[in-house]
């Protein structure tokens, strides 16, 4: 199957897979950018030999100069111009491929970074909640300590009073502190 393209040149594409071959011999599909494949074009050279587009692009300057011997100045200019055009197409194609590849890589990195930012934001939010809970407990303990420090010392009465001794500010049972902290935290929730 042959498909027309720019410059009235033909593009050879295999019928089933839609695959083609670029000027440098790389295969491509309609989904991946590559240089526009060119119809094989032959230029007469020294002793009636001819060059394909691929040969013209891939040969060294020394080989090209040997091939150009015996051609008219106009033919030399035309052949060199065609070589330059073909090379530029190849450079443009590889640049397009590189740009698409870089874009895909950057989009992948962006998605990874967005996931990381979301994860860090979630961790930050949970740490803020934990910090608020700890702050509430701290404030409750401070308030309780102030209350105990301000309350007057009352003499102990009753049958167990002799064994307990007087109440001293600052000495409070641990269970009452925990109860106060829990009740303050539960009230705020």
Curated annotation (Swiss-Prot):
It is found in: Nucleus. One of its GO terms (cellular component) is RNA polymerase II transcription regulator complex. Acetylated in erythroid cells by CREB-binding protein (CBP). Acetylation augments the DNA-binding activity of NFE2, but has no effect on binding NFE2. It holds the Pfam family bZIP_Maf. The modification Phosphoserine is found at residue 151. Induction: Increased levels in the VMS after hypercapnic stimulation. There is a cross-link at residue 41 (Glycyl lysine isopeptide (Lys-Gly) (interchain with G-Cter in SUMO)). The keyword Repressor applies. There is a cross-link at residue 41 (Glycyl lysine isopeptide (Lys-Gly) (interchain with G-Cter in SUMO2)). Since they lack a putative transactivation domain, the small Mafs behave as transcriptional repressors when they dimerize among themselves. However, they seem to serve as transcriptional activators by dimerizing with other (usually larger) basic-zipper proteins, such as NFE2, NFE2L1 and NFE2L2, and recruiting them to specific DNA-binding sites. Small Maf proteins heterodimerize with Fos and may act as competitive repressors of the NFE2L2 transcription factor. Transcription factor, component of erythroid-specific transcription factor NFE2L2. PANTHER family: TRANSCRIPTION FACTOR MAF, TRANSCRIPTION FACTOR MAFG. This is Transcription factor MafG. It comes from Rattus norvegicus. The lineage of its organism: Eukaryota, Metazoa, Chordata, Craniata, Vertebrata. The gene is Mafg.
């Amino acid at each position: 199957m042959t498909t027309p393209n720019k410059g009235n040149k033909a593009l050879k594409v295999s019928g089933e897979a839609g695959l083609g071959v670029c000027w440098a011999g790389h295969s491509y599909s309609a989904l991946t950018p590559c240089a526009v494949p060119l119809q094989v074009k032959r230029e007469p050279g020294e002793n009636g030999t001819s060059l394909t587009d691929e040969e013209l692009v891939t040969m060294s300057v020394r080989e090209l100069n040997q091939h150009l011997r015996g051609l008219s100045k106009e033919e030399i200019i035309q052949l060199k111009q065609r070589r330059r055009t073909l090379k530029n197409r190849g450079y443009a194609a590889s640049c397009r491929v590189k740009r698409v590849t870089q874009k895909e890589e950057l989009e992948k990195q962006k998605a990874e970074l967005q996931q990381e930012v979301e994860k860090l934001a979630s961790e930050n939010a949970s740490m803020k909640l934990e910090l608020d809970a700890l702050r509430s407990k701290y404030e409750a303990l401070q308030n309780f300590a102030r209350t105990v420090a301000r309350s007057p010392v009352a003499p102990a009465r009753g049958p167990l009073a002799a064994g307990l001794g007087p109440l001293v500010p600052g000495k409070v049972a641990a269970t009452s502190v925990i109860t106060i902290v829990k009740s303050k935290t539960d009230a705020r929730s």
